[in-house]
Structure formats: C-alpha cells, structure tokens
Amino acid sequence: MGMPVNDTIITKNIIKVSESYLMPLYKKLCELIRSEEVIHMDETPFQVLEEHKANCYFWATKTTAEFSRHPINVFHYANTRSGKVIKDIVGSNYQGIIMCDGYSGYSNHLYPNAKFGSCLVHIRREFINIIKALHNRPAKSSIAQQAVSLLRPLFHMEKHLKYHTKEEKAAERRKRLKPLLDSFYDYISQVKRPLGKLRNAIQNAIALKLRVYRIFENGQVPLTNNPVEQAIRPSTLIRKNSLFAKSIRGAQASAVYYTIVGTAKMNHLNIYKYFKYLFDHLPNRENKDIEGFLPWAKEVQAQCHI
C-alpha cells in the first residue's frame, strides 16, 4: 500500500517546492529583467479566494526579441491593478522603456525616470474594428480604412530594415518609417468632428503619440506589445480550467512556475527535462550561486535543450 495522496497534499507540496527550492531562481530572473533597457509589460485578472475580492492580477514582464541580454519572462502576483505594482517588479527608479498598452497605471507621474512605449498594433486594431463594425456606413469606414492603409506600409517596411545594432535600426526607422507615421498622424489629426468609436480611436492614437514615437529613439523598442500578451495566454487558459487560486501562497507559487516555464520556453528547453535537472541539483547545491541553473547556462542547455 502506498502513501495516500489527495489534492490538498499535492497542492501543499507544489507550493512548498516553489518556496524552498525555486524561489532563488525566480528572484534571480526578477533581478535580471530589471537590468534590461527595454521590456514588455501587461497584466491579466485572476481570482484568489483568500483575498476576498473579485479580481487580483498576474503582471507579466518579458524581454524584447531583439537586443536583450537574455530571453526572460517574469510573472508577478499582486492583489491590485494599481500602477504602484510596477515598482515591485522593476523598482521605483527604473530608467528603461516599458512597452505597454494605454492603461493609466503606466504613469509617468508615478515613474518619472521611466519611459513608456505604446503598441502600434493596438492602435491599428481600433481602426480595423471600426471597419468590421461599420461596413455599411461608408463615411466613417473610409476614414478608418484610410488610417489602416497609412499604417500598412510602415509594418511592411519594418520587416525589411537593414541594420546590425539598435542604433542603426533607430536611424533606419527615422529615415524610412517616420515619414509614414507622420502621414498617419497628420491624417487623423485633421478629421473633423469624429463620432463614437472613430473619435475614441483617433483620440487614443493622438494621446499615445509620444509613446509610439519611442521607436525612433531606441531601436530596441518594438512596434507591438503582442509578445507579452502571448506570454500571458497560457495563464488565462489555466484560469479558465482552474477558475481561481484558493490562497495567496498558491497564487505566488503559480507566478514562480509560470516564470520558470515561460523563460525555459524562450530559451528552447524541454520543460520536463529542465524541472528534473533543477530538482536533481538545486537541493544539493554546495554554494549560493544560482547562475548555473538559469535557462541559458551552458550545462542546462547541454542537458535540457530541445
């Protein structure tokens, strides 16, 4: 007869493992992402019964596909969507650029040393949605269609830029993309008395113009925040299946596991092999150095690469 195991025992041990063995690795990844010059950030709701409120949140942070030191994807649990959570993730004096959506929590008043970039794909999507919804109202649709048409060559041009460094990329963008983006903003700025969703789309695009133009300051800034939204997607699928976490410790443990799995995937590791490697070696490591267990470490790559 084996030891009886139930859901409660399994859950307690999953949490215990995250706190006792995986936390140093998690903290190291959190530390490293704070040193990145440009990062993606987004948040998604999650219910935690112990908090006695409708929504808590997982905040996701991800390094950029180009020019980052290492591929990292960090999840942070918080019981609020307040922009004050950002300081718990990257510190109150973060001086890099945070790619984000238009949510007011990403505030220069709260973080005067940081810069915020905005997702041009989100801006374009608002006009695309108008075209889909107002196909039988040609006046509004034609304005939205023209706005989308003005952005289309910009995305095409971005894919064909030639550069080796982020400085060269920024210079190429200023030369080739800026006239296209200027034309888009010139056009939507002269639209007279827009109404409804068209007005909202135009006002939002204009409000975020300074943040959109970050792409000309730093070539590492991407045009889109989609990568972090895609990184969040697995956690939303888990939310649909599990519905909620019972405890705060459970939610925090989830953030640890999401972080390690997400970062392992970005570094092309076999997830099962990586966790086995961690559990075989972490409990018996002779020193406090965690560097050798990071997903891009030489031995980890040798043992766990897909």
Where are these regions (language model features)?
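Catalytic center-proximal scaffold of phosphoryl-transfer enzymes
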Residues: M1-I306
